[in-house]
Amino acid sequence: MDQFASVFGKAGSLIRLDCRSLEYQYFPFHPEGYRLVLMDSVVKHELASSAYNKRRQSCEAAVAAIQKKHPHVEFLRDCTMAMLEEAKADISAEDYMRAEYVIEEIQRVLDVCEALEKDDYE
């Protein structure tokens, strides 16, 4: 995503990238009166040896449970919280929490994009 932003970024805009289709959309970003702070935590991440694989397995397990009632679902991005709630009995507590986090984060991005289109920074 960093490389994508470096190549396709443009002044006064943020990019929303769909990593499945590589479609992208620009959203206006003119935060007059606000400051944006970016930080480097200097933490190195090794996906192969991190908890990434476990989190991915949790998400895949949640999708498998959701697919029992919603066979069109391929990924958590295709799910709603209502779908996840329907499958809760078939998902471990840890997998449920991880899936819930992903679905909420996807919705947060959509909400931010909608707010950016309205120049709503509150």
Regions found by a protein language model. Name each.
Residues 8-122:
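C-terminal nucleotide
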